[in-house]
């Protein structure tokens, strides 16, 4: 199921002293995997958080399930990132938005955050080369830092653009993997148009690793 393409070409970029890896045509059979992962909507992410606008003004869904067939992929990315896997589960993101002024992507960015270590993302939307992943400078605004500590993610996920400095955008492409240091770089999905203000979900598969 999760066979990698033969003769993978790994592009390595050094950005601010950190390696960012990009691999196009990552999976041998991406359509089969996409059908397997995204045939049905995944459960709501953080569905028990309160207060929340998830499934009210937008849908943020995540599949978490174990599949032993994914282990060789995780081991490959672990070796590439030189970090241990944080988990071995299949993990996905599925996101779409209501047409509501709350979802103000023109003036706001979606929930910049950091993770435990390297992140891998495989993009699964065809003909989308815009809504990828943004990397930001370190978050230093005190009010923003307090919000992250005290406000549930899905209650105020949109943050004012002027409070963040975007330093790089990782460009999406169907069946492209990007692997970057999600602890070093605050990051979040790059919503810059209304493509996913519809029945279509923004779909990707994610991998998490942890620094030593």
What are these regions (language model features)?
Residues 1, 5-7, 120, 164:
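Intrinsically disordered, low-complexity regions
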Residues 2-110:
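Non-heme Fe(II)/2-oxoglutarate
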Residues 98-212:
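Catalytic core of non-heme Fe(II) oxygenases with the double-stranded beta-helix
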